[in-house]
Amino acid sequence: MSKIKLLSSNLVNQIAAGEVIERPFSVIKELVENSIDAKSSQINIMIEEGGHKSLQVFDNGIGMPKDDLKLAFKRHATSKIETQDDLAKINTLGFRGEALPSIASVSQLSAKSIEHGHTDGFELTIHGGEAKSFVPAPGLSGTQITVKNLFYNIPARRKFLKKPDTEQRKIIELIRQFMLSNPGIGFSLSANGKEIYNVVFGTLETRIKDIYGKNFSNSLLPVELSKTPYKISGFTGNLNTTKKRQGDQFLFLNGRFIKDRLLSSAVFSAYRSLISRGEFPFFVLFLQIPLDSVDINVHPAKLEVRFQNEWHIYHVIKS
């Protein structure tokens, strides 16, 4: 008798969740990315107990029709790519079709959505990957997703979650990244019913003021550089903005927050003779490069990317 067996689709999703969904932060990241891709102008995020108890992301985006709402929670179902060629020109934040089924397989999830321009919305409820109900949901706008009891059915994963305060700080840091990369979108974030952020759409400069205070704008230095085929824009801070810790350095590649030591070091090099060792400057920089010259399908968290010519980009930034 064969000892090799095909895994059930739900078990496959739970295994995939180990890669895609590590903690409450991961859930919020995937859901907010979907809201941005859905052309939302307002995104509201609510968490309880650092996401241990519940996480909610509500938006006013284009929403989903009835059949798409069901299909969205099937693995590798996505509206964002269709062919292998599309992988070379990804211009959305999400694209794999793994996040929603992974989240649904390890939580108690409710997803409500209504297609823009329609009057009939629907609510899908899934517990541990098993669909419980699919019913009409009147009075909706956009998409509303509620995730409760993350990893409730995988105790070994749940016990490794960080303390609620730690998870909350990580989520606040994430939402700050989203707010800076999308100043044209209004955001609100509340934790345990207490408002943390509530910002309206505006410019990058006004968004920085919203986060860091009105006086902070006096310390900003605008950056604008175009060197075909690259464009760099944003702000760096003067010496008044330096801190003895990292965390206020934001590099966005085609609208996506990335972590790249080499490219960040290009910015640091400009400050090397001006600041002490162990001090870090403030910057919010947007790098626009051709989609086919970067591979974002490198890491499940999509924070790491691979460039065709990273050293050339390094010298463009350094200049």
Functional labels for PLM-detected ranges:
Residues 1-319:
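N-terminal phosphate-binding caps/lids of nucleotide- and nucleic-acid-binding domains
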